Amino acid sequence: MKIPKSFKVFASTINVGFDNVRLSNEGVLGDCSFTDNQINICSEYKGEKVSECSTVDTLYHEKVHIILDAMGEHKLSSNEKFVEVFSRLLRQSDESSKF
């Protein structure tokens, strides 16, 4: 899957970028800020290449945080178990779609 450079949530453009050094130093594969309209993910983590599967999982995970925050659902957004399961289901539904 190609990683988008940006996407829309309501009227906001959410930018997607790579920040391998900072995220590796923080011990995470991704982070996001709805306030800053930004998702950051890793393509390398502590010098090792991150698999495409993990990169896409991370993008979906952070995208769910952004969507929940946009909806004002901050409690759900802080529930990592919910976000992880929902993001995996969303990815599966997208990737298994038939046209």
Place the predicted regions along the sequence by residue.
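Residue-level recognition of conserved beta-strand positions in structured domain cores
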Residues: 18, 43, 68-70
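Well-ordered beta-strand scaffold positions
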Residues: 12-14
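Catalytic zinc-binding patch centered on the HExxH motif and its immediate surroundings
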Residues: 2-8, 17-40, 49
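Post-HExxH zinc-binding segment in Zn-dependent metallohydrolases
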Residues: 71-99
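Active-site recognition of the HExxH zinc-binding catalytic motif
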Residues: 57-69
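Short pre-active-site segment immediately N-terminal to the catalytic Zn-binding motif
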Residues: 38-58, 73-74
